[in-house]
Amino acid sequence: MKHFLRMLIQVCLYFYCKFLWRCMKFVMRKLTGRCELQRICYGTKPGASRTMKIETSLRDSKSKLLQTSVSVHPDAIEKTIDDIMELKKINPDINPQLGISLQACLLQIVGYRNLIADVEKLRREPYDSDNPQHEEMLLKLWELLKPNTPLESRVSKQWCEIGFQGDDPKTDFRGMGLLGLYNLQYFAERDATVAQQVLSDSVHPKCSKFSKIEWEKKKMDKAIGYSFAIVGINITDLAYNLLVSGALKTHFYNIAPEAPTLSHFQQTFCYLMHEFHKFWIEEDPMDIMEFNRVREKFRKRIIKQLQNPDMALCPHFAASEGLINM
């Protein structure tokens, strides 16, 4: 009974707040002569702050046109803007900037939804050792990370040198599918210097603080390191969940002036991989068994950063030099 009453109160409170909000919107329009979309575009700076407010306004609107505008095809955005202007009785000649601002916001909103679909497609595609393209990507990853060490055979214990668990890496991609391989290859290719350093440090990340003699003298546990490829797949999972949950909207809406793409997602993965590596060393874990604790702490820190509407995770990161900060 108590549970039912609690649910009833929550439902009543929801509808009350919704009714109150509509009343406030009506009053504001009468006082300012502008609809909510106009007030947001004219009163909020470009970037995540504006786009997220526009997205909420469109999604919560009672108009079917506005509700569906967040999921239209990119080619239909321009016509959708015209329809919205007509619905709101806004003269585009008198308010030319409004159409431009709305279009920029919709490109980001629709682009984010499409990016989720693209990423999900890669995640759901399993690694297939009979697929020449998949095999080529995997062998390319080895060449990028170990340019001076030939791979003796396709199935080999050498894969452990770059952080896979066994003789055949295909089994390690089960959780994230091709997405994990795409991200690892992107990191190794687009930010080669950092990737090589992270790989080297991952074997024993404290080596930079001690000489080899000191390391052996202190009998340090080499397990303080981690498996580069496995952690890369794990960080891919982190990036994926941040994307699907909407947490990355703040970042993408601030760094992608139009629609965020798969490249933006991969650049974000590079940043997360680099930052996690530094965070791992700072945390100074006792052994690899502390990985889940460190990862969860890192995840919470990233989420906290993304709660800042002005946040852009990697505006100055090497792999992100092509991004434009709005």
From Swiss-Prot:
Ranges for domain ELMO come to 133-306
Sorted keywords for this record are: GTPase activation
Q: Which Pfam families match?
A: ELMO_CED12
Q: Does the keyword Metal-binding apply?
A: no
Q: Which GO terms describe its cellular component?
A: cilium; glutamatergic synapse; Golgi apparatus; synapse
Family matches, as InterPro entries: ELMO_dom (IPR006816), ELMO_domain-containing (IPR050868)
State the superkingdom. Answer: Eukaryota
State the Gene Ontology terms under molecular function: GTPase activator activity
Gene Ontology annotations of biological process type = cilium assembly; protein localization; protein transport
What function is annotated for this protein? Acts as a GTPase-activating protein (GAP) toward guanine nucleotide exchange factors like ARL2, ARL3, ARF1 and ARF6, but not for GTPases outside the Arf family.
Report the protein name in the record: ELMO domain-containing protein 1
Native species: Mus musculus
